[in-house]
Amino acid sequence: MEKQILLLPGDGIGPEIIAETKRVLEEIARLYHHTFQFVEGRIGGDAIDATGSPLPEETLDLAKGSDAILLGAVGGPKWDGNAPEKRPEKGLLQIRKALGLYANLRPVRVLKPLMGASTLKEEVLADVDLLIVRELTGGLYFGEPRERRQINGEDGAVDTLLYTRGEIERIVHQAFQFARTRKKRVVSVDKANVLESSRLWREIADEVAREYPDVTLSHMLVDNAAMQLIRDPRQFDVIVTENLFGDILSDEASMITGSLGLLPSASMNTSKVGLFEPVHGSAPDIAGTGAANPLATILSAAMMLQYSFGLADEAKAIEVAVDRVLAQGVRTKDIAKASENAVSTTAITNAVMEALALKSASSR
């Protein structure tokens, strides 16, 4: 298989974790006889410093010509005083919009060696493996009008929660398609007891469900879903929800694992082109120290192999390699206990690559 992958290192620790993930992908290409062509572009604060724009046209052209995009991180205090249009995060919003990346995927899988890092009890965490599918381009964050105005003689503000049938149908279809490759259960999260947009969402989810008789659909109000994620996260397989609810629930679910340094994510469109990135931020305080944890980015690359390229075996090989490394007690500083010796960004990547090579040798 031949694929072009756009690397967007971005800011802070981004260049370090992207460089290490590229090494893992090169090893996958060698072991499984693929050809990955890597191109690199600027985004975020790095792009602002170099070009004045958080998303230069050159980067957007590279994105449109690539099969998938791997992003490091954007942002940092250096650019906090910039105007909104000149903030690093604007580049990420712009590339999502330009590529029509409407589906955000946030897998939450609790790894046995790191159960102690979570604030939840181990019996609650055992076998947690869920996927949150969040609608990314509609809803309250994008609806118009959005404005300040005078209301009955005092300051007021208006935001608009707007969804169309097409926006709801396509994200719900995505959720059902992902569920078919998992445990075949979808929970649609809404606020249908209060919001008209949620009542439409629920009606359309029921209609879409009839096209997937092999998948079970249930509905849950968002306040109950927030509680159930903590009470019993094992009950969930695929959660699908609108933008605001998904933003909140995915951050809540991320803490089930106990470490942001292990959480990958993806933003995808209908054609399976995706932008893959770690959930964590740019961590400028440790940039250049060799202490960054690359595992979330490496696992994001595994998502890319599975969801954009259809390479399920290769994706699984990376996940198994990461699991093996953690089971061996190899840790970067962010996930190491006080009594454990932390290793560098490069060292933990080397361990992942060694685990990949061992798995490949054993399967011959």
Curated annotation (Swiss-Prot):
Record-stated family: Belongs to the isocitrate and isopropylmalate dehydrogenases family. LeuB type 1 subfamily.
EC category name: oxidoreductase
Protein name: 3-isopropylmalate dehydrogenase
GO-annotated cellular components: cytosol
Gene: leuB
Note describing how the cofactor binds: Binds 1 Mg(2+) or Mn(2+) ion per subunit.
Cofactor: Mg(2+); Mn(2+)
PANTHER family, per database record: 3-ISOPROPYLMALATE DEHYDROGENASE (PTHR42979:SF1)
GO molecular function: 3-isopropylmalate dehydrogenase activity; magnesium ion binding; NAD binding
GO BP: L-leucine biosynthetic process
Protein EC: 1.1.1.85
Species name: Shouchella clausii (strain KSM-K16)
Record field: catalytic activity: (2R,3S)-3-isopropylmalate + NAD(+) = 4-methyl-2-oxopentanoate + CO2 + NADH
Binding annotation for Mg(2+): D223, D247, D251
Function: Catalyzes the oxidation of 3-carboxy-2-hydroxy-4-methylpentanoate (3-isopropylmalate) to 3-carboxy-4-methyl-2-oxopentanoate. The product decarboxylates to 4-methyl-2 oxopentanoate.
Keywords noted in UniProt: Amino-acid biosynthesis, Branched-chain amino acid biosynthesis, Cytoplasm, Leucine biosynthesis, Magnesium, Manganese, Metal-binding, NAD, Oxidoreductase
Binding site for NAD(+): 76-89, 281-293
NAD found in the keyword field: yes
Annotated positions for site Important for catalysis: Y141, K191
Pathway entry: Amino-acid biosynthesis; L-leucine biosynthesis; L-leucine from 3-methyl-2-oxobutanoate: step 3/4
Subcellular location per the Swiss-Prot or TrEMBL entry: Cytoplasm
Binding positions for substrate per the UniProt entry: R96, R106, R134, D223
Stored InterPro entries: IsoCit/isopropylmalate_DH_CS, IsoPropMal-DH-like_dom, Isopropylmalate_DH
